[in-house]
Amino acid sequence: MLKKIKISLILALGLTSLQAFGQENPDVKIDKLKDNLYVYTTYNTFNGTKYAANAVYLVTDKGVVVIDCPWGEDKFKSFTDEIYKKHGKKVIMNIATHSHDDRAGGLEYFGKIGAKTYSTKMTDSILAKENKPRAQYTFDNNKSFKVGKSEFQVYYPGKGHTADNVVVWFPKEKVLVGGCIIKSADSKDLGYIGEAYVNDWTQSVHNIQQKFSGAQYVVAGHDDWKDQRSIQRTLDLINEYQQKQKASN
C-alpha cells in the first residue's frame, strides 16, 4: 500500500512539474517534431472565436530559422526569448509564407533583432500596397535555401487561401509546412476566405500532393496539426463550399 502511495505521489509530482513547465510561457507552445525542427503554436481571436496558429522553426548550426511568426506582436519577444532559453541560439532568418499578420506580421520585429527577413515578391507587393512592414529580401515563387548544414525549399503551389500562399518543405525531415492553404483535420469550414481563390484551391492542393508525396508530416496553418488527414480534409472542405455555392445559385 505504501509503495502504491509513493508511486502515486511521484506521478503527481511529475505531472505538476510538466504542467508548470508548460505554463512558463503561456504565449507560445513548442513541440519537437523531428530532429531539429519544432512546431510552435500561438493563439489569437478572430470574430470572437479563439484559434491556434501553427508554424515551425529550425535549429541549425548557424542559428534559428523561423517560418512565419507568432500570431500577435505582443508574443514576439517572449517567443524569441523562449527560443534562446531552449536552444542557446538566436533567430537569424525569418520567412513569411503569405501577407496576413499571422505569417508576415513579424517581419519588422525579426529585422530589428538582426535576422534576415524574406518573402516572395508577390507577398512583398501585397504588403507594399497595404503599407505594412516588408521583408528585407524577396524572391520569386520557388526558392531553395541552405543555412549551415540544413536545407529547405519554399514552393508556390498556386492560389488558394490567398493569391500568394507558399508552403515550405524540409527534405531531410520529410516535413511539409502547409501554412494556411492547408486546413486542419478538425476544421469545420475554410475559415477566412475574403482573399481566397476557392476555384483554384483544389488544383493547388493537388500540386502539393504531387510534389511532396513523400511527406511524413504536414503541418496545417491553424488548430490541430497532429492529425495527418489535413490535406484530404482541405479538399473535402473546398468541395463542400463549392457545392453549397452551386445550390444557392
Swiss-Prot record:
Keywords carried by this UniProt record: Antibiotic resistance, Hydrolase, Metal-binding, Periplasm, Signal, Zinc
One function term, GO molecular function aspect: zinc ion binding
Gene Ontology biological-process entries: antibiotic catabolic process; response to antibiotic
Enzyme class: hydrolase
Residues the record lists as binding Zn(2+) 2: 102, 180, 222
Cofactor stoichiometry and binding remark: Binds 2 Zn(2+) ions per subunit.
Cofactor(s) demanded: Zn(2+)
Residue stretches in coiled coil: none
Predominant location category: periplasm
EC id: 3.5.2.6
Highest taxon of source: Bacteria
CDD domains from the UniProt entry: BlaB-like_MBL-B1
Reactions catalysed: a beta-lactam + H2O = a substituted beta-amino acid
Self-association and partners: Monomer.
NCBIfam families hit by this protein: bla_class_B_core (NF012229), bla_subclass_B1 (NF033088), blaB (NF033107), blaB-IND-MUS (NF012146)
Name assigned to this protein: Metallo-beta-lactamase type 2
Gene this protein is translated from: blaB2
